[in-house]
Amino acid sequence: MQAKYSFPEKNAFRAREALDTDFDIDVHDPKLYINLDDIRILSEETDYKDSLYFMLNIDPDTQNLDTTAQDYSKILFLGHRGCGKTTEIRRIHQYLNNPNRYFAILIETEKELEVSKMQAEDFFITMVIKIIRQLKNAGLSGATDSFDDLLKEWLNDTEVQKEITNTAGVEGNASVKADTDGNILMKALSIFKFEAEIKGTLARESKTTTTIRSKIKSNLLDFITKFNNALAEVKEICASNNKGRDLLFIIDGTEKSTFEFYEEVFQKNGHILRSLNVNLVTTLRLDAFYKLEGKPNLDFYESVFVPMITVNDSNKDVLAQIVTKRIDANSFFEPEALAYLVEMSGGSIRQLLRLANQTLLFSRGKKVGLKHATNTVKKEGEKLYHALSPDQKELLKNKKWVDNWSHPDASMMLYAMALLKYNGNAKINPLIQSYF
């Protein structure tokens, strides 16, 4: 049973939960959202949303999709862990998923897949299943038939068909198509399209999983052709039913994937994404981006960076609201203690929440003073510093990371947040600044 919260929370235990870095504000209360654009975007050059919308052919004056362009945008949405990418990308999806813009499909991979086990082919399987299910939810179930040729190829194996139908307990399932007439392929097709739990299906090394992955890998051209044919049909159906002028996939949550996964999808198989006749925005780990930058197939992506927030006196109160909207500040924080945590967050939402959460732990729920806040910052800084290798410490000491982000140590320090990148510049995380 989901806990009931009363924001700003006054119960110490629920307050700590609300300050957890994985606490989903959109699930618990969207009103907890803080619009940070005014303090994040410092110039036209750093207005990442306007840049993204223009790349996607959204007319700045009408705010509608201009359909005169014939190309398909493939955009990398980049930023530090905890800078607010997921929160912002959900709102970007809400804006773009509009009859005058796009039929936009949001895929949050952490919800849909076991990200740490995700393989390159799973990326494409999930795209197919998610657009099918969103079409059904939009009242366009008939449009999902456009994908049947592709899915029949995937499921054209008796063992796969039996595995899918047995897993679903098909005999007693009324939602399976009534006109299957004992055709196990059609039963399996219907279940796979509308009912199969994606995370469970792809997490297991089942016959279904290995067969579909193998078919995509061994015949990429066939997959691309059939997927593109289906997308072309669906695009016309969406437009004629006033559901969107074009199609757009937005993919988030791959940060726990291995570097090898990124290399496989975005570089080695980058030509597949390039060949798909659909617009795509996807997040990418910052360190992976710099490691892959300049390699074949990376040059056709456009990039949008969500900049870190530079903390200063004019925006500290706004950043503090990330905490004070969730918990009652008067119950848990002396003003100077919270102000200190904001300053030491480096403008990272994730780091601010982590510091506030840990400080509340160390105080055992009592009101936090500056001493508790200082001790928390010291402990968190020690952990980050001791996790660095000698070579990484040397890079930080001599500032050798500048203009050398492809270096494995430099790029990994971005991922670990030992280095924080602000609008093109990078600084050492304030938690460990005193060591250097």
Predicted segment positions?
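The catalytic "switch" region of P-loop NTPases
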Residues: 11, 49-50, 210-342
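Walker A/P-loop-proximal flanking segment of P-loop NTPase domains
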Residues: 1-98
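P-loop NTPase nucleotide-binding core
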Residues: 73-74, 79-242
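Short, hydrophobic/amphipathic alpha-helical patches that form generic packing surfaces
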Residues: 122-133, 325, 358, 415-419
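Surface-exposed polar/charged interaction patches
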Residues: 25, 42-48, 55-65, 99, ...
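Gly/Ser/Thr-rich loops at beta-strand to alpha-helix junctions
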Residues: 82-85, 255-256, 345, 349-350
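C-terminal alpha-helical "lid" subdomain
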Residues: 330-344, 349-436
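A short acidic (Asp/Glu
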Residues: 88-90, 116-119, 258-264, 291-295, ...
